Regions:
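C-terminal boundary/linker of central alpha/beta nucleotide-binding cores
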Residues: 1, 114, 118-206, 210-214, ...
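Loop-to-helix "switch" segment enriched in basic
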Residues: 1-4, 31, 91, 97-128, ...
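Short, well-ordered secondary-structure microsegments
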Residues: 129-135, 144-145, 185-187, 196, ...
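Tandem amphipathic alpha-helical repeat scaffolds
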Residues: 230, 270-284, 307-323, 344-362, ...
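Residue signature of alpha-solenoid helical repeat architecture, marking inter-repeat boundaries
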Residues: 244, 264, 268, 304, ...
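Amphipathic alpha-helical segments of tetratricopeptide repeats
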Residues: 254-255, 295-299, 331-342, 371-382, ...
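C-terminal non-catalytic interaction modules
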Residues: 489-555
Length: 555
């Protein structure tokens, strides 16, 4: 990969992880049809005071609105199409001649829905209108803290904005239930696309869009930093869940071309957010998306990339199965760390050099690099892989050549102060790989049942985190142990599921790690001697049909 060049056309940027149902900003919609709430100061259109939900359509009613049978032209912002029937242009895309629904933010929005949203906006008071407009900058769901930080200013001071939000919610917002375990039970909302379109138009007309988008991007920076801090402090599942839930807004902030300033001025913000979310790309199975976003942001920067940005670029190349492409980036990152005086980045780079050497099968070099990483890394690293990850990497490098040294590395990792977190705060990614090492060591001692139990545990932990590479490696190790135990069909099912996983997640250039290649070759050699071609193909297809999640529960 060459830093400074935009991503190739068609490069995937979607969810290539294993966690399902975490991407949409709204995981459950609670349709609002409750009682009308008190209004705001100001006059209605008929001159009377107050505002109630009965004065205009609720968000639910707007979403359920359908076009009439008359085929009337689409009404946008209260303005119909011209008398000659020309299609109205919305966000650069004309609607159909018969008033067909318009696509907004990837979803079809009917003319009646837009008209109903206009009527609801028109019946709001001044404060509700202003907040309606400002909330249109959010791409996904949001909570009260986000509203206060992004939208509170001027005519909407922080002391009053939450009361305005409560009055506006029944008219323009839908409550959502997307809280994760341990989070404070505070209401969260989502603005339907018809309402958002109306608010975005008014915000632009008012001339406030530029400052609101910038405030939204600064809020996204803080959000990404919070997720990174949670990951480092041991709240790894919470960090992943937070990043996934807020990904619609974070994704917008990671694209410098959507900023009101020049793309080069906002590229640093985009790079910072992308680097802060390193764990989401590296440890949670979204390497392709992270690689695309980082390349895009770096291509718009005017100055040299930071050491951490180059470190992440190299790590993403490695996770994408291109270790040779990671080597030159590692050299650039080292030079950048020396140039910028970023001593903390040196430990990150030593760890990544060890991971790259291990990927390529250079186990002795990998062990040396992991030892250097431990020497360079602080007691409590504030960014990147933990000391526990370095100890586990060292053990993984030694487990097939020096099992006693590998066991000693695992023991040292358990004694390390960084590794002595509570069960809730452990490094779950390193924990999953440690079970792979324990499975290898148990197999070395001839304890196949115990080895299979460790491999199965590693598989489940990697699936839980969403790591495709880790899950594939653990499944292939479990398949080898099943072959050794005489369970040929179960082993073939696991290998078939791994093939499907790698095909669906990685592109054609992906090359598995050398230790995975060796494990796979051992299993397939035995399976080909036990099953003919047709039987083996059928077993692979059956495993692909059932999938790793199902097989992990049965193993």
């Amino acid at each position: 990969m060459e830093i400074g060049k935009p991503a190739e056309t068609g490069e995937p940027a979607g969810n290539d992880g294993l966690e399902e149902s975490r991407e949409p900003p709204v995981t459950a919609v609670l349709w609002s049809d409750g009682e009308a709430r008190s209004g705001t100061e100001g006059l209605r259109r008929d001159g009377t005071e107050g505002l109630s939900a009965a004065d205009g359509p609720s968000a639910t009613e707007v979403l359920s609105a359908t076009e009439g049978s008359s085929g009337e032209p689409t009404v946008l912002w209260g303005q119909p199409t011209g008398p000659s029937g020309e299609p109205t242009v919305l966000w650069g895309e004309p609607t159909g001649p018969s008033g067909e629904p318009t696509v907004l933010w990837g979803e079809a929005v009917g003319a009646d829905q837009l008209a109903a949203a206009e009527r609801g906006y028109a019946r709001c008071g001044p404060a509700e209108r202003l907040l309606w407009e400002r909330l249109s900058v959010f791409e996904g769901a949001f909570g009260r803290d986000a509203v206060r930080e992004v939208c509170a200013s001027g005519a909407l001071p922080p002391a009053k904005i939450l009361s305005v939000l409560e009055r506006l919610a029944p008219l323009a917002l839908l409550p959502v239930d997307d809280l994760f375990d341990g989070e404070n039970d505070l209401p969260r909302y989502w603005m339907p696309h018809p309402m958002r379109a109306v608010g975005a138009r008014r915000l632009t007309d008012r001339g406030d869009r530029r400052i609101l988008v910038l405030r939204h991007r600064r809020w996204c920076v803080k959000l990404a930093r919070r997720a990174a801090d949670w990951w480092q402090s041991g709240r790894q599942l919470d960090a992943r869940d937070l990043a996934l839930r807020e990904l619609p807004d974070l994704a917008a902030a990671m694209d410098p071309t959507t900023a009101p300033l020049s793309a080069s001025d906002e590229a640093d913000t985009a790079v910072e957010i992308t680097v802060s979310l390193w764990f989401l790309w590296v440890a949670c199975g979204r390497a392709a998306e992270g690689r695309t976003r980082l390349r895009h942001a770096l291509s718009l920067r005017t100055g040299p990339p930071s050491a951490r940005a180059l470190w992440l670029a190299a790590f993403l190349e490695l996770e994408s199965g291109r270790p040779d492409a990671a080597d030159p980036l590692l050299a650039q990152a080292w030079a950048a760390a020396v140039r910028d005086g970023d001593d903390r980045a040196l430990g990150l780079l030593a760890h990544l050099r060890g991971a790259t050497a291990l990927y390529q099968g250079r186990t002795r070099a990998a062990a040396d690099e992991f030892r250097e990483a431990l020497a360079l890394m602080g007691e409590y690293p504030e960014f990147g892989p933990t000391r526990h990850a370095c100890w586990v990497g060292l053990a993984l490098s030694l487990c097939r050549t020096d099992p006693e040294a590998a066991q000693e590395a695992l023991d040292q990792g358990d004694l390390d102060r960084e590794s002595r977190w509570s069960l809730m705060g452990r490094d779950l990614c390193a924990d999953a790989w440690s079970h792979v090492v324990r499975a290898e060591l148990a197999a070395w001692d001839g304890e196949l049942d115990r080895a299979a139990a460790y491999a199965r545990r590693a598989l489940r932990k990697h699936l839980r985190m969403g790591s495709a590479a880790g899950a594939a490696g653990a499944a292939e190790l479990l398949a080898q142990l099943r072959v050794a135990a005489g369970e040929r069909d179960e082993a073939a099912h696991l290998l078939g599921a791994v093939d499907l996983l790698r095909t669906s997640v990685f592109d054609a250039s992906y090359r598995p790690a050398e230790y995975c290649v060796v494990t796979r070759a051992r299993s397939e050699t035995v399976l080909r001697s036990l099953l003919d071609g047709k039987e083996l193909r059928y077993a692979y297809e059956e495993g692909a049909r059932r999938g790793l999640f199902s097989l992990a529960g049965e193993a």
